[in-house]
Amino acid sequence: GFEGVALKKAWAIAKTESNGRPMAYNGNRNTGDSSYGIFQINMLGNLGIDRKEKFELKSNILLFDPVINAEITYYMTQGGNDWSSWPSYNSGKMKEWLGKFPS
């Protein structure tokens, strides 16, 4: 799983995306979202089809399981090394949480 700096970034992304809530859902299709869980994995359109197949998900509801959500996020970020698919990383919004990581 996530370790060191990657763990801090993962925590900050989760806090920014969902405030750490495993049952968070953003279904705003106007903004291109159908995002699930703690890391807000987007399943809209072809993204969802590809991700369901790649991660053997029978239903998007499984993404509300924080362990499954984190495992998929770990894979998608190449072990926490590439967060470029997360707008909160690209915009820098997650930085406000980096300094608040629990010690």
Describe the residue ranges of each PLM region.
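Export/targeting segments at the very N-terminus of extracytoplasmic proteins
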Residues: 1-20
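Catalytic and binding regions of secreted/periplasmic enzymes and modules that target cell-wall glycans
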Residues: 9-12, 23-103
